[in-house]
């Protein structure tokens, strides 16, 4: 028996979606509604054989979901709203409360809204998306899938910041980590491809894209991750600085009379690859500029790789070794240069890349005699979300759900 599951990612002015047939994991359609709240909202829906695009007014998220469901019916992707058996919602922050994906109830939704203080740009709109789908599809169970939940297995030394204790105890300031859905999916696929239980592996997963994070996974548990209290921290990213000396901020604020909001804009939107290269936040553009001799672009690429290498080194120490290094995300999956730079001169760890395999994006790119496996695995957060819907909302199907 097959089930139609929707995976939803609601943004402040957008709604990204995918409809999957489960447990096969086949994508039936995917799309995006952008510029919600505007008279010229952009609607894109794609199947394997067709693509529809139009510009229409979309007043709010309720209008967006209503429009999406109307289009699925109109394009005969579904015959009835009852064809949708469940809906999975990506939620940015689960705090310490949610340690796994969960079936949405009124109480669950209220808790997601209360956690908005930890993710003010994301949780409110994630909750709004859940609320609208529950209204319009009352017979389809909704499941909340949290970016932070996979990292709730971190031990205290990995998540506590060396600040006065009350900042954690009273305000919840700690490392939470993000990209958990991606790290969980990719590590599961790796274990399946190796034919080894994830519980027997020490894995470092590099999710590299405009937002990047590194995750150490030991015996199937996240034991450390580079993003912290917010997705701004950790390694260098497209427009985000990652970790810097915190005293730089008050120094800049005093010298340039910047407000906290302006400092946040600087760290989140003007730094990283864009800030150092002066070219672009897109790794491909920076790579192209570096190839033409642009010194700052070359430096940006070097910094990007070195911050990742330093993080990998510390995680190998923490886990007492490494069995597999995995690359995923837009850069991790597509840039041979980035992978090569991260793995450069690591033969002393038993880690070496075969450049011919690397250039053709093979699944395993380590040399024949390397002790550490190096893998390139496409992430699929939507499939992971759909699998969690099956596991939690349709438990009779649990045995059918395996990573694709």
From Swiss-Prot:
Q: What does the UniProt keyword field contain?
A: ATP-binding, Cytoplasm, Kinase, Nucleotide-binding, Transferase
Name the GO cellular-component terms. cytoplasm
GO BP annotations of the record are: acetate metabolic process; propanediol catabolic process; propionate catabolic process
The record lists the catalysed reaction(s) as: propanoate + ATP = propanoyl phosphate + ADP
- The reply on keyword Cytoplasm is yes
State the top-level EC class: transferase
The GO terms this record gives for MF are:
acetate kinase activity; ATP binding; propionate kinase activity
Q: What induces it?
A: The BMC operon and BMC production is induced by growth on 1,2-PD vitamin B12 medium.
EC number assigned by the record = 2.7.2.15
Where it sits in the cell: the answer is: Cytoplasm
The cross-references to Pfam families, in alphabetical order and at most eight, read: Acetate_kinase
Effect of a null allele = Decreased propionate kinase activity, cells grow to lower density on 1,2-PD and excrete more propionate into the medium. A double pduW-pduX deletion grows as well as wild-type on 1,2-PD.
Q: Which PANTHER family does the entry link to?
A: ACETATE KINASE, ACETATE KINASE-RELATED
What family is this?
Belongs to the acetokinase family. PduW subfamily.
NCBIfam families recorded: ackA, PRK12397.1
Please give the name of this protein.
Propionate kinase PduW
In its UniProt entry, the species of origin is given as: Salmonella typhimurium (strain LT2 / SGSC1412 / ATCC 700720)
Lineage from the top down? Bacteria, Pseudomonadati, Pseudomonadota, Gammaproteobacteria, Enterobacterales
